[in-house]
């Protein structure tokens, strides 16, 4: 039986929305940040409590300003490695928030933190899908480089 190619149609993939692309890019960025912060053996430290674990073993990309601030969702300087305990539960406590603030001031300076605070008050940016896709592609390339550096590729 010959297949009639003229009438045969492939199921088309649904195009992703901008918010879906932003979420995928954010996941990739968090992975990249953990890899970048890890040593050559793949271990990184939580910026708030100091526990050291493998980059993919109960470590997450913690946000200084929460992801609800879309300005910072794809902002690399706002994301750092945190253990799951600090990221999920600890950020609700003043002690962990203060530890993260001290880390940020040591890393970037008080002036930069104030500038980020002013940015957090702005309206959410309108991401263009092609820009987000390109950003994600670049991050995925950086992830490959980091995986190669720690010997996991």
Regions of interest found by a model, annotated:
Residues 21, 71, 92:
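Conserved aromatic-histidine-acidic binding/catalytic patches
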Residues 51-54, 79-109:
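Short Cys/His-centered divalent metal-binding micro-motifs
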Residues 76-86, 105-136:
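Short Fe-S-cluster ligation motifs
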Residues 1-32, 37, 51-52, 116-153:
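A boundary/linker detector
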Residues 45-79:
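Histidine-centered nuclease catalytic patch
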């Amino acid at each position: 039986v010959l297949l009639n190619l003229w009438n045969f149609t492939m199921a088309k993939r649904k195009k992703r929305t901008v918010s879906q692309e932003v979420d995928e890019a954010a996941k990739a960025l968090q992975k990249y940040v953990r890899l970048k912060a890890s040593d050559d053996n793949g271990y990184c430290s939580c910026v708030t409590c100091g526990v050291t674990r493998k980059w993919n073993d109960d470590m997450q990309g913690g946000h200084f300003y929460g992801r609800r601030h879309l300005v910072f969702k794809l902002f690399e300087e706002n994301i750092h490695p945190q253990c799951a305990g600090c990221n999920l539960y600890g950020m609700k406590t003043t002690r962990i928030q203060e530890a993260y603030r001290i880390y940020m001031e040591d890393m970037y300076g008080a002036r930069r933190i104030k500038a980020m605070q002013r940015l957090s008050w702005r309206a959410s940016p309108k991401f263009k899908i092609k820009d987000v896709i390109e950003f994600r592609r670049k991050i995925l390339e950086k992830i490959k480089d980091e995986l190669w550096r720690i010997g996991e590729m």
